[in-house]
C-alpha cells in the first residue's frame, strides 16, 4: 500500500514539474469556460421549456 502511495506521489510530482506552455493553458481555460457557458445555456433552455 505504501509503495502505491509513493508511486502516485512521485507521478504527481513528475506531472507538476512538466511545465505546460502558456498558450496551451490559455486554450484549455478558454475551452473550459466555453463548455461551462454552453452547459448553463442548455440548463436555462431546459428550465424555460419546462416552465412553458
UniProtKB/Swiss-Prot annotation:
Expressed in testis (at protein level). In brain, expressed specifically in GABAergic GAD67+ neurons of the thalamic reticular nucleus where it colocalizes with ATP2A2/SERCA2 (at protein level). Expressed in the bladder and in the atria and ventricles of the heart. Residues 1-31 are cytoplasmic. Reversibly inhibits the activity of ATP2A2/SERCA2 in cardiac sarcoplasmic reticulum by decreasing the apparent affinity of the ATPase for Ca(2+). Binds preferentially to the ATP-bound E1 conformational form of ATP2A2 which predominates at low Ca(2+) concentrations during the diastolic phase of the cardiac cycle. Inhibits ATP2A2 Ca(2+) affinity by disrupting its allosteric activation by ATP. Modulates the contractility of the heart muscle in response to physiological stimuli via its effects on ATP2A2. Homopentamer. Can also form heterooligomers with other sarcoplasmic/endoplasmic reticulum calcium ATPase (SERCA) regulators ARLN, ERLN, SLN and STRIT1/DWORF. Monomer. Interacts with HAX1. Interacts as a monomer with ATP2A2; the interaction decreases ATP2A2 Ca(2+) affinity. Interacts with VMP1; VMP1 competes with PLN and SLN to prevent them from forming an inhibitory complex with ATP2A2. Interacts with S100A1 in a Ca(2+)-dependent manner. The chain crosses the membrane at residues 32-52. Disulfide bonds: none annotated. One of its GO terms (molecular function) is ATPase inhibitor activity. This is Phospholamban. GO terms for cellular component: calcium ion-transporting ATPase complex; endoplasmic reticulum membrane; mitochondrial membrane; phospholamban complex; sarcoplasmic reticulum; sarcoplasmic reticulum membrane; vesicle. PANTHER family: CARDIAC PHOSPHOLAMBAN. The modification Phosphothreonine is found at residue 17. A lipid is attached at residue 36 (S-palmitoyl cysteine). Its main location: endoplasmic reticulum. It comes from Mus musculus (Mouse). Coiled coil: none annotated. CDD domains: Phospholamban (cd20250). Belongs to the phospholamban family. InterPro entries: PLB (IPR005984). Phosphorylated at Thr-17 by CaMK2, and in response to beta-adrenergic stimulation. Phosphorylation by DMPK may stimulate sarcoplasmic reticulum calcium uptake in cardiomyocytes. Phosphorylation by PKA abolishes the inhibition of ATP2A2-mediated calcium uptake. Palmitoylated by ZDHHC16, promoting formation of the homopentamer. It is a single-pass membrane protein. The modification Phosphoserine is found at residue 16. Keywords: Acetylation, Endoplasmic reticulum, Lipoprotein, Membrane, Mitochondrion, Palmitate, Phosphoprotein, Sarcoplasmic reticulum, Transmembrane, Transmembrane helix. It is found in: Endoplasmic reticulum membrane; Sarcoplasmic reticulum membrane; Mitochondrion membrane; Membrane. The modification N-acetylmethionine is found at residue 1. GO terms for biological process: acrosome assembly; adenylate cyclase-activating adrenergic receptor signaling pathway involved in heart process; calcium ion transport; cardiac muscle tissue development; circadian sleep/wake cycle, sleep; intracellular calcium ion homeostasis; locomotor rhythm; muscle cell cellular homeostasis. Disruption phenotype: Hyperactivity and impaired spatial working memory with no effect on sociability or preference for social novelty. Conditional knockout in GABAergic neurons of the thalamic reticular nucleus results in hyperactivity, altered sleep architecture and impaired executive functioning which gives rise to impulsivity.
Amino acid at each position: 500500500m505504501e509503495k502505491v502511495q509513493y508511486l502516485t506521489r512521485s507521478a504527481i510530482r513528475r506531472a507538476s514539474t512538466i511545465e505546460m506552455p502558456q498558450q496551451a493553458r490559455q486554450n484549455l481555460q478558454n475551452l473550459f469556460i466555453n463548455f461551462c457557458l454552453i452547459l448553463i445555456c442548455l440548463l436555462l433552455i431546459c428550465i424555460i421549456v419546462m416552465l412553458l
